[in-house]
Amino acid sequence: MKKILAFFLVFALAGAVFADEPSAEAKIAEFKGDAAVTFGVDLDTNRTGFKNEVGGSIKLNLLNGGDKSTTGDGIWGELKLKINAFTLQAKADKNVNLLTKIDDDDVKVEIDTAKIHIGPAYVGIKKGDLNYGSNFWYPNALNYKDGDDEYYNRTPSDKVKYDQGLVLGYEQKDLFKVETAFRSQKDTGKKLDKVEGVILPKDTEIKKGEYFKSVEGAHDNAKTDDVFDDAALVDPIPGKTDVKKLKATXAVFKRVMKDGDTNYWTDKYALGVYGEVKPIKDLRVAIGTAYVFGRLSGDKDVLKAVGDSDNRGDITFFTGAXYKLSLLEKFVVNPVVTYTLYADAKWNGANEKLXYPEXLKTSMLKTGVRFGWGEXKKSNSLLYDFXGKNTLVYDTNKEDKGDDKLLPGVSLFGAFDLVNKNIETKLPLMXTFYSGELVKGLNVAALVHANVAKDASEISRVVPGTVYAGRMTKAXYERLIGAKGLQIGLAASYDVKLNDITIVPAAAMLWTHGMLKGEADTRMTADEFKVEAKVDVKGVIQNTTLSVFWDEAAFGKGTSKEWTFGVKHDEQNYYTLKNGVFGLKAKIAL
């Protein structure tokens, strides 16, 4: 809190300097609250009870977000600073805290652009890795952009871990731009932070130098104390040389490292080239590639010792195209296609030279298209509200950092992994739909996600000794459902107006299916059906919503008929049933 107040004082004093840029203010942006009482019946236990809830929040804007840039023409330096809005929030169940999209109690000034312009040419002096294509987003009706989910949202080329240097570019606005990037790699050493004790279960796979038998051994990084080399504690794994598995549950110790000193003068370099052209309005085509030279100095023995630890010889490639075709006033067709490649060079100790494996590390083609009609003010779909953050296939457990608007329309997305025969086991397609204001009062959200590969199997590798080697169990069922290989969801609501009263019936259904193949065309399958429904009544009592609901209902079945992996098993079934909760609710909101 002291840091928050300190930042506020700094920006308050700077208010006269920043004009239309970030400015200090003290303004209440939101002040609201609600209280609710629910009477529910657990249909599984036939037990009843009340639940009281209160909520409230106040948001106080202390600093408007904004940016400030230098200007000029001819030969000039461009620097653009950005800062997020700075808001304090207090809730009924939480003390005052900082409310920004930044983690931790911190307000950061971001350097958005740093370039030296020479007419249409420029020299960029801001750090950045050579992973091209990060601004090619796949359109989606439900707009679930997660900041760390690059699978369903975007796919820039793989990072080569060279981010220091400069960029030489030439740009004609709205026509084209080309860039050549010269990057070097900094080396940040690691040093011991602390030693932690952990308990590892039987059959845990460990690597050399990862765990030690004593605190002293871990502290000193003693090779004689390495669990990996103790035949009494670990067994080798057939076909693997870099990992072994524990014979029994054991208490071991590990080294926790932290960053040490950083050396920027390493003689390690990489080169990248990127081009982007806009031949017609709203059409963008791009291509980019990078090559890692690695360490350039040193004799043969030095370079041999380095090997490919500096990513020497690696090649990355990106190409993509995006188009936004506007039809009439608010209809739009938005297709996007991207392809990324990464060739990972490996050091061949026998020949003492770099060589490329037969298979690429990455070879991925992705494409998506949206036919849409306008935008919505809502940030969550009804399907999201009913099913929750962790249940739906497209979301992760991290905070959503995407846009705060849904995109009415229908979208289709597909990903094609062209490495080896991966496409034979994993070929995801996803269709989504959001109605928006297509029909007044009607709100519909839907998704279909399926692995349509020829030999689709959500968990492609079965290891003897795991929950899959024997029969269908609760653990196997939950793992298969968690893989979310096939998911179909539908949610809908409709506003019924009766004079001053509004009745809003709503319901949602979500089917999730998982499957695992064994030998001789045998398989394990798991299915889960979730159903929820409610009716809200508004206007009978001022400022109050009356509801009747049925939620948390689910039925699931897992089966393994004549499942074969090593040995053949009889049919095994696992069932789960939740009748859910039925209840009445009254909520007063301000």
Swiss-Prot record:
Protein topology in the membrane: Peripheral membrane protein
A GO CC annotation given for this chain: cell outer membrane
Major localization listed first in the record, in broad terms: membrane
Subcellular location, record wording: Cell outer membrane
UniProt keywords, alphabetically: Cell outer membrane, Membrane, Signal
Signal peptide limits: 1-19
Cystine connections: none
Function comment: Major component of the outer membrane.
Protein name: Major surface protein MspTL
Gene name tied to this protein: mspTL
